[in-house]
């Protein structure tokens, strides 16, 4: 099927990707521009979460926005700041995405009238819940890969007892500083409670001051707020850019032994 002729038209896109991460996306955009004749303008920002709201409220939103967090898209959809996708996109997404209907559900939110509509589909999905380490460093120190949260805590304590630093953690991300901590907290929640508890938390049926949520936050704090557990001490966690945080794994000798993605 041939691409439509969009000569003379402009498509504006805003998203969180900056150089060099945006290079692959820009190559896809360039292919679309060549195929259709449209001019495509992409603007990246490390303050996307704030800027997209400001632009939408001012009536200056882009044609397309790349949301790192579906929750923000849901909030804006409920305020009437987003336009739903055509009805045909739901079946197309279910048919062409490996996870099928679940991807449709993740892009479906209530509009300002409370009606569920498809507002987005997933272009780029990041792998989470991985703990990175350098095998040679573990071998040299005599450490084994932990198989449970209890083993992970024990290994963390062992590394400290050996006079080393177990973790590199960085939460810095410009105006969005702090979001990597949400990955930790979400992961711990899913490892601590059944999926339905996580869903209640996401939909705000269970508030943030619920004892379960507080316990999960405190568990994360045991890693991030202990000066002996993190490279640079706990006060550095918020200022180290998340993109730079894994670098300590590769120093010789290593500045830390583990980094969570």
Which stretches of residues belong to each language-model region?
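Short helices/loops that flank or line small-molecule/ion binding pockets
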Residues: 50-61, 79, 137-138, 154-162, ...
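Extracytoplasmic/periplasmic solute-binding protein
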Residues: 110-123, 129, 153-206
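Extracytoplasmic/secreted proteins, especially bacterial periplasmic and envelope-associated proteins
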Residues: 20-27, 31, 47, 51, ...
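Short, solvent-exposed loop/beta-turn-alpha elements that line the ligand-binding surface or hinge
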Residues: 4, 86-101, 175, 191-215
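Hinge/lid segment of periplasmic solute-binding proteins
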Residues: 2-5, 70-129, 180
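Conserved N-terminal structural module of periplasmic/extracytoplasmic solute-binding proteins
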Residues: 1-81, 88-97, 141, 145
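Glycine-centered hinge/linker elements that transmit conformational signals in sensory
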Residues: 156-158, 202-238
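Paired acidic/hydrophobic, glycine-rich loop segments that form the ligand-binding mouth/hinge
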Residues: 63-66, 168, 257-261
